Regions:
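Generic structural signal for residues in well-ordered beta-strands
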Residues: 7-10, 90
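Short acidic low-complexity segments
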Residues: 9-20
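FMN-binding flavodoxin-like domain, especially the glycine-rich phosphate-binding loop
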Residues: 33-158
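Short glycine-/small-residue-rich Rossmann-like dinucleotide-binding loops
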Residues: 29-30
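Structural motif
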Residues: 22-25, 52
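Short, solvent-exposed polar/charged micro-motifs at secondary-structure junctions
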Residues: 19-23, 100-102
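A short, Lys/Arg-enriched amphipathic alpha-helix followed by its capping loop at the start of a domain
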Residues: 1-7
């Protein structure tokens, strides 16, 4: 997205300042039922009337399934204020994962999640959890850069 728009990409770990920004775009990976860094980035933040927030989630789950989107958005509601959630333009993209390239801590987190989910009968799993179980330990790439186009159009409207 940064390459296609010329907008700078800043890691949530750098605690970016938003007060002087008209448009804020947060792009985060889905991990363990939440959007990585979302809650810490927007803790105690209120969007001004002149600001626009775009949140983009990226994961391996099939975002054509309404139940997957509902699961993601329900999780997001627990991560950010109601004001931010209501005002945000939210997009859900599919990305890729390669377990061999994950850090040791991420692999450990995924292993714990896998172990936990395996104990739940398959028919009782959410579609997001089923996708996790189906791709666990493998490389999976669902990236389609064409799905950036609606986000770029939204950015250009401002």
């Amino acid at each position: 997205l940064s390459e296609r728009t010329g907008l700078p990409a800043v890691s949530y770990n750098k605690h970016p300042e938003f007060k002087d920004r008209n448009i804020i775009i947060y792009m985060g990976g889905l991990y363990a039922g939440g959007v990585l860094g979302l809650s810490s980035t927007f803790r105690n933040f209120t969007l001004s009337d002149k600001q626009k927030l775009i949140i983009v989630t990226v994961g391996v789950s099939d975002t054509n399934q309404q139940s997957v989107i509902s699961d993601i958005q329900n999780s997001m509601k627990n991560q950010i204020s109601d004001q931010l959630f209501r005002r945000a333009e939210i997009y859900h993209l599919r990305g890729k994962i390669d377990y061999q390239n994950l850090s040791l801590s991420h692999r450990a987190m995924m292993a714990l999640m896998h172990k936990s989910l395996k104990s739940v009968p398959y028919e009782n799993q959410t579609e997001e959890n089923q996708a996790f179980l189906d791709t666990y330990g493998k490389e999976a790439d669902f990236t389609d850069l064409a799905f950036l186009n609606p986000i770029i159009e939204e950015i250009n409207r401002n």
